[in-house]
């Protein structure tokens, strides 16, 4: 009886991180409505990441790929996700696509720039058709994720992976024949002035493909480096501490893809001292 009790306790210990429903929203964009954006392969990432998540117990899964991944559709899916969440749920959000710096209108960034995800219908330059309202800036992303956090409570796990790049302060150009996610030019919004706003707290974990001064280069097969690492290493990442997980992904970067003179390293931000990104993965025998 004692042996059975110990086994039950260990099983419960392994599953404790996965209480509640496991939900996910995956967004991937390759070709954009505005031809000024370079063709990338974020759409391929989306299906690969979705498959990896299903293998790790995410049954409530929404995928937005290509032209359906407009700004309005992404916001709507975030709102649906938040509305369905319950206390203790595990929620995962993934974005593969272009990123861009844009004028920080509300003044919460010391450098004057917001980072943004680029939906399918966003334009690369400020114009009458897009004055910035089609970009998904970090303030909006924060508000959408905060709504999810409020629903799942402090017992829930909220993890985000971003296989994009902003490269706003990088002056180095990528090597020839290398596909890079992100652009050098920022989206400049004319403004008569900015007021100062408090920087919002990041109440989740965000795993990004590279640091904000680095380029995010695709692998030769078109896969995003971070997406490929997560899908390939999923079985090895379960249970790792955050620094160990970052080391594993860095090793994958170094082993795979074209040999490049431009370094790229993953980075994790948010509640790294109290939560583990690896808890999204299920331990396998």
Regions found by a protein language model. Name each.
Residues 21-37:
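Short glycine-rich His-centered loop
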Residues 48-61:
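Signal peptide-proximal N-terminal region
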Residues 17-19:
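Boundary at the C-terminal end of the N-terminal hydrophobic targeting segment
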Residues 28, 138, 142, 146, ...:
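Active-site-proximal C-terminal subdomain of hydrolase catalytic domains
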Residues 5-14:
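Bacterial N-terminal signal peptides
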